[in-house]
C-alpha cells in the first residue's frame, strides 16, 4: 500500500548535508517527495511511496548521516497523492 508521511527531523540537522543524504537515501528506497530546511533549525520532508519503503526512510532519518545529531523525528501520516515524480531538495 502506498502512503504519504510528513516528517520533521529535529536536532543538529542543518549544515551537515542532511538534505542531500536524505535525497540519496530516498532514491535508493524508491520514495518520492521533497526535503527542506526550516527556519527553526529543523528539516521537514514529504515522503511518498510503498509503506515499507517510506518506513525505511523514516528509520534512516532517526539516525541521519554521521555528521548529524538527531534529537527527534515527528511523523504525520496521510493519504498517498502521487503528485511527485522524483525526490528533490526544496528551498
From Swiss-Prot:
Catalytic activity: an acyl phosphate + H2O = a carboxylate + phosphate + H(+)
Domain of life: Bacteria
A GO MF term: acylphosphatase activity
Xref: PROSITE patterns: ACYLPHOSPHATASE_1 (PS00150), ACYLPHOSPHATASE_2 (PS00151), ACYLPHOSPHATASE_3 (PS51160)
Catalytic site: 19, 37
Pfam families for this protein: Acylphosphatase
Cysteines paired by S-S bonds: none
InterPro entries recorded: Acylphosphatase, Acylphosphatase-like_dom, Acylphosphatase-like_dom_sf, Acylphosphatase_CS
Residue spans crossing the bilayer: none
Acylphosphatase-like domain sequence ranges: 4-91
Top-level enzyme category: hydrolase
Keyword Transferase in record: no
Keyword annotations of the record: Hydrolase
E.C. number: 3.6.1.7
Gene3D superfamilies, per the entry: 3.30.70.100
Keyword Hydrolase: yes
Annotated family: Belongs to the acylphosphatase family.
Name of protein: Acylphosphatase
Upper classification of the organism: Bacteria, Pseudomonadati, Thermodesulfobacteriota, Desulfuromonadia, Geobacterales
Amino acid at each position: 500500500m502506498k502512503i504519504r508521511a510528513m516528517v520533521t527531523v529535529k536536532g543538529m540537522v542543518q549544515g551537515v548535508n542532511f538534505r542531500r543524504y536524505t535525497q540519496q537515501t530516498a532514491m535508493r528506497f524508491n520514495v518520492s517527495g521533497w526535503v527542506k530546511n526550516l527556519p527553526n533549525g529543523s528539516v521537514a520532508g514529504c515522503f511518498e511511496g510503498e509503506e515499507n519503503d517510506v518506513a525505511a526512510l523514516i528509520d534512516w532519518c532517526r539516525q541521519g548521516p554521521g555528521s548529524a545529531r538527531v534529537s527527534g523525528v515527528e511523523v504525520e501520516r496521510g493519504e498517498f497523492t502521487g503528485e511527485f515524480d522524483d525526490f528533490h531538495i526544496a528551498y
